[in-house]
Amino acid sequence: MKKKNIKNSMNNHTPMIKQYLSLKSQYPDMLLFYQMGDFYELFYEDAERISELLKITLTKKGYSNHKIIPMAGVPCHKSEYYLSKLVKLGESIAICDQQKETDCKKKLISRKVVRIITPGTVTDEVLLEENEDNFIAAIWKENNQFGYSVLDLSLGFFGVSKIFSSCDLLSEIERTNPKEILYPENFSDVFLIESRKCIRKRSLLEFDLETSYKLLNLQFNTCSLDGFGIEKNNFVIRAAGCLLQYVKSMNMTVLPNIRQLKYNYMEDSIFMNFSTRKSLEITQNISGEKKNTLSAILNKTVTSMGSRMLNRWLNSPLKNFKIVRNRHESVEALKFFYKELQFILRQVNDLERIYSRLALRTASPHDFVRMRSTLEILPNLHLILKKIKSKHIKKIRLSIGYFEEVLCLLKKAISLKPSKCIRDGGVIAELYNIELDELRSIKINSKEYIKNFEQKEKKKLMIESFKIKFNKIIGYYIQISKRHTHLIPKYYVIIQTLKNTERYSVPLLKEYEEKVLNSEMRSLLLEKKLYAEIFNIIEPFLEKLQNSALALSELDVLVNLSERAISLNYTRPIMSEKYGISLLESRHPVVECFLKTPFIKNSVFLSRTQRMIIITGPNMGGKSTYMRQIALIVIMAGIGSFVPARYALIGSIDKIFTRIGSADDLSNGYSTFMMEMMEISNILHNATSNSLVLIDELGRGTSTNEGLSLAWSCSRYLININKSMTLLSTHFVELTKLEEKEKFVKNFHFSAIKSDLHIAFLYKIKNGISKKSYGISVASLSGLPDSVLEDAEKKLIEIENT
């Protein structure tokens, strides 16, 4: 955020602005919400910024230091609505509350920052995206390698990775999608992250190795980090230490919900770089939206926990066939139970995030209600799960648990419909505490007492307009019409005169008011105490609650995959340690869902003797769709899903690379051709014999001869050096001659039928070569003038006959 010099001389400012500037200087990079009564007000550049971001009125608040004070504000009771918008925009906010009213009207009210909100450290339900993880990340670079750490405070997840290249770092950032990134002041690769919304430069001291090591051991109550696999991994220790320190300082508290550190072994999952994720549109489409993605088709989970877990799985398909086969076996076993299980799971609330708020002691009364309703349905869930004969489902069932003690406590202690916040009272249930019930009865009976007092006095004084009312400023008062004031006894004390009425007080009424107000205050204090005790009682169950939340999430995902398999006619894939991919009558999982006509099924066979498939055919003929569907089917199989094919055998895949489509990166001075060459270079350097490589129209963007030469040499490198499983589409017919020279290459094509200037695509892959690209016929579909198309046809005949 840009800073303006707004304090030439502190002495010339008003006391309130002096206080504001003093607080603002402690949080220069954040918007300061400064409480003024029932409003949060922002001044100077903060006011201008929030006015622009939220489209609220920019006004002024008088003068200070001989200058107008720009001001914008939001009501305190609506602050969460505005905070949610700001967090989504990547803004951070410091909340400054009034601390104590002063008896002297001229004396400045004391204020202090009571809460800091940043995009990566929020845990409040209203500030979080329901179906997305909310990671904050830290990066440390040394010797061209990176330590990368992520933390989701709302889930209690803390993880680290060691990354060996900037390209892999970009891929990991894309996979985890952190809402906030911390980096050291000497970080030389800022360009990798500068396009993200919220990045923060931190002092090198915050990445100090010794301090980080001590902080991590202190957090986990250990004397060594060996148990987490990072004892001598200085890169990740620095990143994790900085991250932990920052999150603690932002939350102004310890982090009891962070119970373990997970080391992410990159080799456990199928590697996909940034370009691959983007072109395959796994969880985001090319426009950055969620529609028309693999996730949009597969993710019909019924809990927010399950939705987040499935998206994590989609971004990290596994290489561990044992885990994958367990998932496939579970999906198969759940086929006969998914309807009744989904009915129950729809009643499961976000136990994962409730757990974190419980551990942080920020859980709201409504969190307890949601937790209670979730625990109430667990016995019914167990009854169904016990019917399913699956070892993995049994393991999940045992992890879910019952929590009878916690449920009993919540039923007794929390009202059926509590207020939103403990400070409003009405949270603790009746009969839970005798003293609280007695204090509440005073207030409840007060209405009857006041009513009786009013009727008695009205009858005694014979005043028709006699009424007893209450407001927060003067408390209980007697209101009488001015025409009856001559009937008022002398012991009635006048407290306010209005146009047509007068207001009075009497000692008896004041005494009762003090009794009621005192009981209300004592009642609220007791409720807060009892509320805190509930956290203490639940604390020993927190770890099991976290495990239960994870088990419920996985169950939701597996039940969802079972439903998808039946609804979309998917087949259970065979996972083989052998080399290759065999798919019979496969379909594109996303495209088939949006077609009004049946999807044309196609097969593929990749093996040690047929490592490369060269595909020719017209644009829009189905080449790119065909290549993408193979990669998407591999990903689906790798997360435990069934796949859109009649038969699927998936061998061991370590990486997926794609070079399908590219936009010019003009901001870095890269053309389409340069971007293509950089991506191909990355593939040639990193693909292995177990990698799946998809390349669309290699060699575009330069002269035909040069493009063909590059395509030829890159293809031979992939065949003989990388030995990867490769699908390559091309318009260079000459490239198909590789089949004659390299024994591992096979030519296939997509065909079309042409009549006059019109074309019909068949979308069926066949052996052999397509002699024509049908470019002019495809161009006719774009609406080019007939004269242009006719002229092009003539020129084509002329060139071909030359």
Swiss-Prot record:
Q: List the HAMAP family hit by this protein, alphabetically.
A: MutS
Q: Which residues form a coiled coil?
A: none
| Protein family per UniProt | Belongs to the DNA mismatch repair MutS family.
Which organism does this sequence originate in?
A: Buchnera aphidicola subsp. Acyrthosiphon pisum (strain 5A)
| GO cellular component entries | cytosol
Molecular function as annotated in GO: ATP binding; ATP-dependent DNA damage sensor activity; damaged DNA binding; mismatched DNA binding
- Disulfide pairs here are none
This chain's function reads:
This protein is involved in the repair of mismatches in DNA. It is possible that it carries out the mismatch recognition step. This protein has a weak ATPase activity.
Q: Tell me what this protein is called.
A: DNA mismatch repair protein MutS
Gene Ontology biological process terms from the UniProt entry: mismatch repair
For this protein's source organism, the top of the classification is: Bacteria, Pseudomonadati, Pseudomonadota, Gammaproteobacteria, Enterobacterales
**Is Cytoplasm found in the keyword set?**
no
Identify one Pfam family in the record.
Answer: MutS_III
Q: Which SUPFAM superfamilies match?
A: DNA repair protein MutS, domain I (SSF55271), DNA repair protein MutS, domain II (SSF53150), DNA repair protein MutS, domain III (SSF48334), P-loop containing nucleoside triphosphate hydrolases (SSF52540)
Which key words tag this protein in UniProt? Answer: ATP-binding, DNA damage, DNA repair, DNA-binding, Nucleotide-binding
Q: Among its keywords, does the record have Nucleotide-binding?
A: yes
Gene name tied to this protein: mutS
Q: Where does ATP bind?
A: G617, P618, N619, M620, G621, G622, K623, S624
